[in-house]
Amino acid sequence: GEEVAVKLESQKARHPQLLYESKLYKILQGGVGIPHIRWYGQEKDYNVLVMDLLGPSLEDLFNFCSRRFTMKTVLMLADQMISRIEYVHTKNFIHRDIKPDNFLMGIGRHCNKLFLIDFGLAKKY
């Protein structure tokens, strides 16, 4: 009975990217702030990616905080954001979709840890 996040993509999608994204997560596994992938496969008419459940995005938090963060919050978040992006770069990939919606806070014992998600547009360099 553990809660997880499930990302679905129609197998009829014009530009399928979930298989590619699942392979990228496998390359990045073990990095701080990279969600753990539980399973990738096909079910009925869908490609399915199952990963650890995470908390709110930076966009969600920014809205919750009336679109104002303290300097301390900005600096603490920026430090983690830069670290996540640098880690992706050490694996010779660029994310190509950096935005507040793609940075999520962890939950439980990881509630102060920032995670980077959505590698569907990432490219090797």
From Swiss-Prot:
The record, for InterPro entries, names:
CK1_Ser-Thr_kinase, Kinase-like_dom_sf, Prot_kinase_dom, Ser/Thr_kinase_AS
As for subcellular location, the record says: Cytoplasm; Cytoplasm, Cytoskeleton, Microtubule organizing center, Centrosome; Chromosome, Centromere, Kinetochore; Nucleus speckle
Q: Name the family the entry cites.
A: Belongs to the protein kinase superfamily. CK1 Ser/Thr protein kinase family. Casein kinase I subfamily.
Q: What does this protein do?
A: Casein kinases are operationally defined by their preferential utilization of acidic proteins such as caseins as substrates. It can phosphorylate a large number of proteins. Participates in Wnt signaling. Phosphorylates CTNNB1 at 'Ser-45'. May phosphorylate PER1 and PER2. May play a role in segregating chromosomes during mitosis. May play a role in keratin cytoskeleton disassembly and thereby, it may regulate epithelial cell migration. Acts as a positive regulator of mTORC1 and mTORC2 signaling in response to nutrients by mediating phosphorylation of DEPTOR inhibitor.
Spell out the Pfam families in the cross-references: Pkinase
Q: What is its EC number?
A: 2.7.11.1
Query: Is Transferase among this UniProt entry's keywords?
Result: yes
Protein name (database record): Casein kinase I isoform alpha
Give the source's domain of life in one word. Answer: Eukaryota
Q: Which UniProt keywords apply?
A: ATP-binding, Cell cycle, Cell division, Cell projection, Centromere, Chromosome, Cytoplasm, Cytoskeleton, Kinase, Kinetochore, Mitosis, Nucleotide-binding, Nucleus, Phosphoprotein, Serine/threonine-protein kinase, Transferase, Wnt signaling pathway
The reply on keyword rRNA-binding is: no
How this chain assembles, per its entry, is: Interacts with the Axin complex. Interacts with TUT1, leading to TUT1 phosphorylation. Interacts with FAM83A, FAM83B, FAM83C, FAM83D, FAM83E, FAM83F, FAM83G and FAM83H (via DUF1669). Interaction with FAM83H recruits CSNK1A1 to keratin filaments.
Please list the GO terms describing molecular function.
ATP binding; protein kinase activity; protein serine kinase activity; protein serine/threonine kinase activity
**Source organism of the structure:** Sus scrofa (Pig)
Q: What gene is behind this protein?
A: CSNK1A1
Which residue ranges does the record assign to the Protein kinase domain?
1-125
What Gene Ontology terms describe where this protein resides (cellular component)?
centrosome; ciliary basal body; cytoplasm; kinetochore; nuclear speck; spindle
List, from the UniProt record, the residues annotated as the active site of this protein. D97
Q: Which GO terms describe its biological process?
A: cell division; intermediate filament cytoskeleton organization; protein phosphorylation; Wnt signaling pathway
How does it get modified after it is made? Phosphorylated by MTOR in response to mitogenic stimulation, leading to its activation.
Q: Which reaction does it catalyse?
A: L-seryl-[protein] + ATP = O-phospho-L-seryl-[protein] + ADP + H(+); L-threonyl-[protein] + ATP = O-phospho-L-threonyl-[protein] + ADP + H(+)
